[in-house]
Amino acid sequence: MAIQGIEGVLQQLQATAIQAGQMDRGAAAPGVSFASELKTAIGKISDTQQAARKQAQDFEIGVPGISLNDVLVDLQKSSISLQMGVQVRNKLVSAYQEVMNMAV
């Protein structure tokens, strides 16, 4: 299961890279705002954490069909997605501070 999940993520990343390459660099996509994209990304991180937590709880109470390796992989995915979110936040704060320090 973990390998299939990784392959799915790789395919999604490749599709996103292709779409990004095809977009015009100077024009913003119509109807897409930074705030909505940020909210969606944070929502995905939250969903990943909730799913991992639920799977861990189900494993603890002995729900059949849930293996320890699946639980550990999902918990690790959750941890990595949170770390990525924190790093993106740090870069955004750094960029904001740099813009605020520019002379007008």
Curated annotation (Swiss-Prot):
Keyword presence, Transmembrane: no
Alphabetical UniProt keywords: Bacterial flagellum
Domain of life per record: Bacteria
Cellular component aspect of the GO annotation: bacterial-type flagellum basal body
Compartments in which it is found: Bacterial flagellum basal body
HAMAP family tied to this protein: FliE
Full protein name: Flagellar hook-basal body complex protein FliE
